[in-house]
Amino acid sequence: MIRTTFAAALLAAALATPALAQNGPPPSPYTPRVDKPTCTRDELKALTAAYVEGQRSGSLAALPLHEKAQYLQNMETIEPAAGLWNTALPVANALSLHDDKRCKTFTEIVVTDGGTPYILGTRLYLHEGQVIRVDSIVTKTGDWLFNANAFLKYTKQENWQPLHAYQRTEPAEMIRGANAYLDGFSDKFTDIPWGVPCARLEGGAYTNRDNSPTASCEVGMPPGVLYIVNRDYLVDEEMGVINVYCRFGGSTGGPDSHTFRYIDGKFRQIHTLTAIPGPQANDEGGMVRGAADPNAS
């Protein structure tokens, strides 16, 4: 009896499957992301060089864009024509990372002239020679601790050269450490690989304005519980850097980019971009005096 009932249930499920499939979501209009994409580091480097020039000219036409590529700005899908990449910007500095395992790039662009300052973080996803996704985080005046002048000043003072092999950190440990940092917003007992010296550049606010050789990034996490979700990783082993795209405070929370530079297994540089309203930094990397925090309760 049990066998008969079980067999009948399996048959009913099998017969129902086509009907369920017919009522399922429509197919995506975008080319799917690939679990194990193919690319080379040289391809990725050529791609970021073309992207930076494209941002200078206001066109991505020189990029090998898939006809069904997906375009996102601040983690919302948009039409290609609506992206800031269509606006010619006077790029003051560009820092690019390349992950030839995941076939992703990340380029941090600072714009201080032209009337509207920006700090951008743009990812390109490559597979078989074509860009299948363009994903840009755009921050500007009014966003969290924003100050493009300070961001430019301190980025150019930092060392972002490729590391010697003996200075590099295993990718799995880089991901673990980045997760420990982000988990620290909800759990204050995580094992974060703090190094010395270390400096954090958050929108424009800088933790080592005095260039101290003993500076630490361990300046405390904000109180309370804040979950950092939707994490997406890019690891540049040669640079010793991991970049994490994520959302602050839930699946619809603020779009964010955290970039961690490891040397000898420890954090030495951290850059963050967060596209939510907040207090502002000044040109020296400190807080604007009397700035109101729109996120304060």
Protein language model regions, located:
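Positively charged n-region of N-terminal signal peptides that target proteins for export
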Residues: 1-4
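Hydrophobic helical h-region of N-terminal Sec-dependent signal peptides
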Residues: 6-16
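C-terminal and inter-domain tail/linker signature
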Residues: 21-297
